[in-house]
Design a protein with these regions (language model features):
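Metal-dependent phosphodiesterase/phospholipase catalytic core, i.e.
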Residues: 20, 27-125, 152
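Conserved, mostly hydrophobic/aromatic
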Residues: 3, 14, 66, 80, ...
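GT-A fold catalytic core of metal-dependent nucleotide-sugar glycosyltransferases
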Residues: 3-30
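C-terminal active-site rim and adjoining tail of enzyme catalytic domains
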Residues: 54-60, 120-213
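Short, well-ordered coil/turn segments that N-cap beta-strands
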Residues: 7-9, 72-78, 95-99, 115-117, ...
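Anionic group-transfer/hydrolysis microenvironments
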Residues: 16, 29, 83, 199, ...
Length: 213
């Protein structure tokens, strides 16, 4: 809610499964346990997950809560991370027109393409493609890729090819290196990329940044 009020309209959620197979928003179970002071068996059940609060204050989100939030905010788009099953998640999400799934294998990207799901190809499978990368993306109607900002300098040719093909590059690893914060990326790297995974809003940025929830 706070990031929405600041102006963010694209929100990233890490999606993982509870022990009883329910999709929930959490980065990983060890980190979640630290943030919630949970001391039970990992992964927890869905019921155990929903009982916990992050830092004792913030509620946890399952698919019901995620769908309720996006129903309440019809101009918001969800970008998923971690989950690599486009069919299962898209069937669970409220509005596939407002869903972009970062996917981590060629097979998952092709499956998403076959079912009309908006895919964002992750860096590792993209860089592993030996043939024409932009052609693969075009053939599979992939309009987004997620890359580390750390490879921009060494992959300028690829960045330009993606830009020329109309493929939007979102970068992560913002705030990982000294001085390389949102403003640095916005001021110095937006010529080669389209958006970034951001922790904070910059007043003169346009709406091309995904807030990390």
């Amino acid at each position: 809610d706070e990031n929405y009020k600041k102006g963010f309209r694209i929100f990233e959620l890490d999606i993982i499964e509870t022990s009883d197979g329910k999709l929930v928003a959490a980065h990983d179970w060890n980190m979640w346990a630290r943030f919630t002071d949970y001391t039970g068996t990992l992964p927890p059940t869905h019921a155990q997950f929903m009982k916990q609060k992050i830092y004792g204050d913030y509620i946890t989100m399952d698919m019901e809560a995620i769908n309720a939030w996006f129903k309440k905010h019809p101009d918001a788009t969800l970008v998923t991370d971690k989950v690599n099953d486009p069919i299962a998640f898209s069937e669970a999400f409220i509005d596939n027109d407002r869903l972009i799934m970062e996917l981590f294998s060629v097979m998952a990207v092709e499956k998403a393409s076959e079912h009309g799901i908006h895919a964002m190809m992750s860096q590792e499978p993209l860089m592993a493609i030996k043939d024409d990368k932009t052609n693969f993306l075009k053939v599979n109607n992939v309009k987004y890729v997620a890359l580390s900002r750390r490879i921009i300098a060494s992959q300028k040719k690829l960045m330009l090819q993606l830009k020329e093909a109309g493929i939007k590059v979102y970068v992560y690893n913002v705030n990982f290196d000294p001085g390389k914060d949102e403003k640095y990326v916005h001021d110095n790297e937006f010529g080669l990329i389209y958006g970034m995974y951001a922790d904070k809003w910059i007043s003169d940025m346009n709406f091309t940044s995904a807030s990390k929830l």
